[in-house]
A protein has these predicted regions:
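A short, charge-rich alpha-helical start-of-domain segment used by transcription regulators
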Residues: 1-17, 41, 45-46, 90
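Conserved RNAP core-binding helix
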Residues: 26-43
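Hydrophobic recognition helices of helix-based DNA-binding modules
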Residues: 40, 57-65, 128, 132
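Arg/Lys-rich amphipathic alpha helix in sigma70-family domain 2
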Residues: 46-72
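Short amphipathic alpha-helical boundary/capping segments
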Residues: 68, 76-86, 108
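Short amphipathic alpha helix immediately N-terminal
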Residues: 84-105, 109
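DNA-recognition helix of helix-turn-helix
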Residues: 110-143
């Protein structure tokens, strides 16, 4: 299928795959798809669909913190910012790898400069490969 000018219904598989990778859960990915498609216009552009998906993803992270029982509000905000940054980096890489989007288009979706998107792509790909190597190492040890 041509990856240019896709309609919203043609993006469901990409969004589901991205949602699974980011959340680690098929149920959470399906919920993100449902929320995204309840908001978008059936004739929305590809960029608008992915922007809406990003909004739904970040909205689902609100209230989550990587710092257990933060002792102050600032620590809770820091924890959320770390989780959000991690999700943004993963989303950037997955938009490029799964959907085949260019850094220019990703920058429009993410609201960042192309330079920042390229940095996140480089850093994020390195992190993904390191994480996968760690997971493969653990699974081989458990055999």
């Amino acid at each position: 299928m041509d990856k240019k000018n896709r309609k919203p219904h043609q993006l469901i598989d990409d969004i589901y795959s991205i949602g699974c990778w980011i959340t680690g859960s098929k149920e959470d990915a399906a919920e993100l798809i449902e929320k995204t498609y309840l908001i978008i216009d059936p004739e929305a552009t590809e960029i608008d669909v992915f922007k809406t998906f990003r909004h739904c993803l970040l909205d689902s992270l609100k209230g989550i913190s990587c710092i257990p029982k933060p002792s102050c509000n600032d620590m809770e905000k820091l924890g959320y910012k770390l989780i959000k940054q991690d999700a943004e980096m993963k989303l950037t890489v997955l938009l490029a790898e799964i959907s085949g989007l260019s850094p220019e288009i990703i920058s429009k979706i993410m609201g960042n400069s192309v330079k920042e998107v390229n940095y996140w792509l480089s850093t994020g790909r390195t992190r993904f490969s390191s994480d996968l190597l760690l997971l493969n190492g653990r699974s081989k040890k458990s055999r």
